[in-house]
């Protein structure tokens, strides 16, 4: 019998397929290292590198060594996918600069039990004397609630994960009554306004995979309105590089065009009143494509193409990014975007408020958190005990806070974390603590699931010897307080029950539990027709050519709370100023030139120096910088400095030492308090740019 090459190959592939499925009895199976036949124990957990809360599986060898992190296929939102930041979390667990011992302000090391006793006793004495405790953390936990209950005095928790997108959540609540998200499983057209869901975000991986799946499987079209050509814009069918802050005229022009192709006798409900579409069409009649193109600064043909896709779609949906909610025109801009959903959809799904581990009266609002740090910077925080837990406020606020904490701007500053950063550098006492990979917890999923669901955050690796878990650290501190044996109620479970009427939680996967009731409030468009009638004409500010507008973009491979992981630093280690060729010619700069950027409305002398990257992927009059880079003292790795290969053999391969670690943008940024909506906004910043 002669065997052809085709038959041989096909038989080989068939045999490999059979062998490949042998022994797989569920969603998880042992991870086999390429250089070894040993099997590693799979432990399902959840990633805490960003607010998305994707499912991970850590592979543990001999119950001591973490060998790999992969996606969890049972997780209902991430569905087995994982990003570079999640995979590199393992790199932080084995970081060569990890904190192993407690450290005082003078740099002297202390034994952990001694340091805990010292910190707990000092906090108790200060609280007894009238001091107030403020906990600043990215990872809100039940341990914080237990510690605050033990204090026997008022305390405040700044939960940064809950506050990061507060402006967007508040803006949506004002229009719909709750935060919403587009139904990506049904939409055939997605209009994205100044958002980059394929780059980063609070629901980065779940949103990105659903958008790509919808494009590939169902042919969903993307129309992106964004001044910068991000990864999201590069995947769009139409990219409109609009001027920053012009989402309102862009959205109303599209809606006006769509109303020309629908039955105008049909009504819509606006703030409880039924409004015929013919009256709505008359109200926004001035927003033509020609007007929008002039205001937004784009070719009218792009609006015509976007309008054609909108008219041809059956199930359009919208998505608005954080910049939409931080502009001066925020209320009108999102009301206009949501009006497209109201008239042509709506394909928006309610998102349940994020369950909190501490009661609402103890959780700081965005304005309250900003006020606390302004008090410290102004020298009015002498009665504050500040506990920074895996947070890095000095990196985010800059020199003013660093000077205040260095000069005793608070009564006591305790920092907890696994790695050094700018905030631990100025703390009175630093306690080493576990990474999120080494602790227990509970992470709530409130999007892309039919009912509110939580995932058990299981330790996928043991902590280093002598390093305590979060629960143990705060438990030891609590023993020294007035009500040391007091435990706080489990507030997040009660919050979900109150919002949904749930009675029980049942298992839907390994360590995944869903409640027996869904969060499904009736969406009500709470903006009146009169609001649009009274809108003032859209005004353009000074010509863009005089001072370019600074745009900020998040990098998915950097971590502002600590030093960069070496694997991620290899991907993106430097910050570049994205500049349009027309602006480069006007400023007489070339790719790679070093320029000095000063904020027009910034503090005198506040500036950063950065190298230029010339690209057509940004509109003229705008420049862009990544917001999460530029560590100042967060370890040698983040500063692109070599150190002994005895600590980590990979360090001899650092090749970006001469290029630097990027820039910290804090000197250029402003924060404005909006007391009406109780949020803190970052207004547009205009720059003076000159070649160094």
Where are these regions (language model features)?
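N-terminal export/assembly segments and adjacent metallocofactor-ligating motifs
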Residues: 1-261, 299, 430, 585, ...
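Short, glycine-/Ser/Thr-/acidic-enriched flexible segments
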Residues: 63-65, 72-76, 88-89, 140, ...
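Glycine-rich phosphate/diphosphate-binding loops that line cofactor/substrate pockets in enzymes
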Residues: 117-134, 180-189, 283, 304-317, ...
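Short coil/turn segments at secondary-structure boundaries
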Residues: 131-137, 160, 266-273, 295, ...
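Extended redox/cofactor-interaction regions of prokaryotic respiratory oxidoreductases
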Residues: 145-225, 232, 248-253, 294, ...
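Flexible glycine/proline-enriched surface loops and loop-helix/loop-strand junctions
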Residues: 194, 235-236, 287-289, 319-322, ...
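Internal, active-site/partner-interface "lid" segment
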Residues: 265-287, 485-497
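Long, contiguous, secondary-structure-rich segments that constitute the structural scaffold
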Residues: 458-516, 567-577, 582-692
